[in-house]
Amino acid sequence: MTSQFAAELCELLVEENFGELFGRIFATLSRYDRLNLPRLKAYSELPNRQLLPALAAMIQQHLVYHYTSYDDGVTYYEANMQSAYYLVRSGKILEFVEERLGKYAATVLSTIMYLGHAQVSYLETLPELTSEAVKANGVPEEHGEHEEDEEQSNGLNGEHSNEQPELLHPTLKALAAHGYIIRVREAQFQSHADNILDAERAIRSKPEMKALKGKRLEEAVIEGTLGLLKERTDGDLTRGLIVHGVPRGAKRKHSSRRADEPNKKCRTDFASVDENDEHDEEEENEWSDDEMGYDTTPMEVSARELYATVSERETEQGVSPATAKVYECLLRRIEYQTHQCRDTAEIPREGEEGEQYSVPIALSALAEDVNPQLDLSSSTGPMDSSQPDGRRGKRPWDGDVEGTNHEEANGLSSGGSGGNRTFEIDQHLSLLAQPPHNLTSKRMVSGLITWTVEFRHLARKLRHLELERMIEARYGDVALRVVRVLHAKGKLDEKRLQEISLLPFKDLRQVLASMQAGGFVDLQEVPRDAQRQPSRTIYLWYYDPDRICNSVLQDTYKAMSRCLQRLRFERSRIKDFLEKTERSDVKGNEQRFLSEPELVLLEQWRAKEALLLGEVARLDEMVAVMRDY
């Protein structure tokens, strides 16, 4: 992340969101890396009356790390590149929250993002989160898409709108259950390297470590450091908020209950949690300070990217829309129970990454999530006599005890139609588990059918698809064929590559030369003797996905920074006009206060701004594929 173009992009994002003062301090820290207060003051050329309040605000926004040394007592400051980059995803995160939890939840999260971190008691006093503001925004209507029992449990149906905490606290717990907010810990204000050094120092000072020596000491220190580091930085608030693998307050798009079930349920979701927490001091301390958590966001983006990949294959490789919807339900279940895409900070190199499977999801749980109105049978082949519902042509039995037990033993739901539908869902997932998709994996856990995905395989597939899409757009389908051959076979000389790809030598050489100039393929020279004569040298072409991903990532950072710079330039050209349109009396009344040419100029500016910001968002999706998954 700490490259020239990444630092430039983060500086632009900070200045775009927080102003020139924050941008100047952040640029100084990113340029000189780690500074104490006197040096920061000298390099930034700012007085104390501006520097100190700005530093405090940037620490509040998690844009700057601070660490006080145990040796000399000097406090050092360091730029937080990761939090600065995630400013570009704030709108996408709020869109996710509004889609899943409603408009009021998005407002609460937006307030926490604006404050950096905040106490719950302070959030209760904010006017934009009061019941009057909620009524004005129409939140009860927004949450009308929930099931009735979820509306009752979340308290978002307007029944308790006279007391604002009754609406705020369930919303905070819903955000915590989804992983959007976390508990503030002191170690989160320090860099990862400083936290490791502090944890290692604390582990080595323990009395039991003095009796160990050599390799055993180093292993014990590493194990203890990782455990202490996880304990200090863990801000998870999902304890007690995940029920049967689904967060409380999750928004459902359909009702899966049967007609004979009661239409209402007891209000036990958040009411029981609040009653149990009233006298629990530890739980109250947990919820005293909250902040925005970005760790789960790549998981959501990854799930959406995988669903988009399956949807694109509907016409290419015969994947039906129903199969894509079933896969979306599986990814949603996995996303609820997974906090991070991977355990390590860096993406392991290809060939060195081990298997990392997600949590297994029971087939019966997926049957509850899939929309009952979704047609699953029309896109699969007919069932034969060996399938669970094998009594085709016969009248179904009403009291089939043996058949019911047989279905339940295999993880299928009881009942005729339920068993058929569960089997159809299993068939759709089995289709995705077969080549060339390889997107799912079937397992038996305690005699029940479960489905899982392999994270590293899917992340690698997404990266390869993105690179192949880019190569095909730049160099054509012939280059794509050559790259696929090199990726499958490894290093090849020109003659062997021509035999496998079935291309003329002239076309092959042109494609290889153009891709080598673009950095997508490279040439390795293997001399046969010590003289290194060209006639006695073997030239091998190869394709390195890791190197290309890193190069594409840097180019993406550069393109994003250029888009933001262009946006700033276009804004400066019509600065006076934009200041006029942003006045409180003009905003919302443009037709009344602006002339016809000014309205045309405003429309052109909004279209240009949407184009540039949309391009930045699209490039951010590429960054997520190349860096975060």
UniProtKB/Swiss-Prot annotation:
Its main location: nucleus. Keywords: DNA-directed RNA polymerase, Nucleus, Transcription, Zinc. One of its GO terms (molecular function) is single-stranded DNA binding. Disulfide bonds: none annotated. It is found in: Nucleus. Residues 556-577 are annotated as: Leucine-zipper. One of its GO terms (cellular component) is RNA polymerase III complex. InterPro entries: POLR3C_WHD, RNA_pol_III_RPC82-rel_HTH, RNA_pol_III_Rpc82_C, RPC3, WH-like_DNA-bd_sf, WH_DNA-bd_sf. Residues 374-388 have a biased composition (Polar residues). Residues 272-293 have a biased composition (Acidic residues). Component of the RNA polymerase III (Pol III) complex consisting of 17 subunits. Belongs to the RNA polymerase beta chain family. This is DNA-directed RNA polymerase III subunit rpc3. It comes from Aspergillus fumigatus (strain ATCC MYA-4609 / CBS 101355 / FGSC A1100 / Af293) (Neosartorya fumigata). The gene is rpc82.
